[in-house]
């Protein structure tokens, strides 16, 4: 059923992932991991 989801939902998930990784990278850089 998830495969039949609207393209906008898929795009939204991708945007959230991009934001998540961007924030994660900034945090790791700030912490010095």
Curated annotation (Swiss-Prot):
Pfam families in UniProt: Mt_ATP_synt
TM spans (from-to): none
GO terms (BP aspect): pollen development; proton transmembrane transport
GO CC, any one term: mitochondrial inner membrane
Subcellular localization, as worded in the UniProt entry: Mitochondrion; Mitochondrion inner membrane
Function: Mitochondrial membrane ATP synthase (F(1)F(0) ATP synthase or Complex V) produces ATP from ADP in the presence of a proton gradient across the membrane which is generated by electron transport complexes of the respiratory chain. F-type ATPases consist of two structural domains, F(1) - containing the extramembraneous catalytic core and F(0) - containing the membrane proton channel, linked together by a central stalk and a peripheral stalk. During catalysis, ATP synthesis in the catalytic domain of F(1) is coupled via a rotary mechanism of the central stalk subunits to proton translocation.
UniProt-recorded name of the protein: ATP synthase 27 kDa subunit, mitochondrial
